[in-house]
Amino acid sequence: MTDKIELTVLGCGSSFGVPLSHNIWGNCDSTNPKNYRTRPSIYLKKGDKSILIDTSPDLRHQLITNKIDTVDAVIFTHAHADHTHGINDLRSIALINKKKIPVFADKNSLNTIKNSFSYLFTKNDKHGYEPILQKNIIDNEILDLNGFKI
């Protein structure tokens, strides 16, 4: 495995994104394409392993735009909507790759995420969804994950 880590900033906009949904740009120059910013997510790749940090509501667009079809693990920085509400877009990746995706967060954040998106973590007999995420609580320790030390 190579030591080179590729970091792709998938989104770096505010919780609203830039521009706002009413095409409000604030102080950003609307003629500069770099000022179109989706909400926060980061993708790390090292060899054939990858980690996604946060699942913004813009995740589907971010994955397609950056030709990302594999996510080996997800780390959530916190449970706010702008960092979690793209979580459902992990379903297609898990189904195509035929494996559950481990997700990591502190206990409170992970409980909030699991309560909001329980169908991704536990079998839902009503709708027939198989769980596609595996929860892992982290607590201020160094995480050695797929060759990444975080």
Enumerate the language-model features and the residues they cover.
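Binuclear metal-dependent hydrolase catalytic cores
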Residues: 1-150
